[in-house]
Amino acid sequence: GVTSNPAIFQKAISTSNAYNDQFR
């Protein structure tokens, strides 16, 4: 889960934000 892998969760958010920047 998120609590078990905060680093992976953080990376997923960073990747999602990167995609959002491309579409805007």
UniProtKB/Swiss-Prot annotation:
One of its GO terms (molecular function) is transaldolase activity. Disulfide bonds: none annotated. It catalyses: D-sedoheptulose 7-phosphate + D-glyceraldehyde 3-phosphate = D-erythrose 4-phosphate + beta-D-fructose 6-phosphate. Its main location: cytoplasm. It is found in: Cytoplasm. GO terms for biological process: carbohydrate metabolic process; pentose-phosphate shunt. It is an enzyme of class 2 (transferase). Pathway: Carbohydrate degradation; pentose phosphate pathway; D-glyceraldehyde 3-phosphate and beta-D-fructose 6-phosphate from D-ribose 5-phosphate and D-xylulose 5-phosphate (non-oxidative stage): step 2/3. The keyword Cell division does not apply. Keywords: Cytoplasm, Pentose shunt, Schiff base, Transferase. GO terms for cellular component: cytoplasm. Its EC number is 2.2.1.2. Belongs to the transaldolase family. Transaldolase is important for the balance of metabolites in the pentose-phosphate pathway. This is Transaldolase.
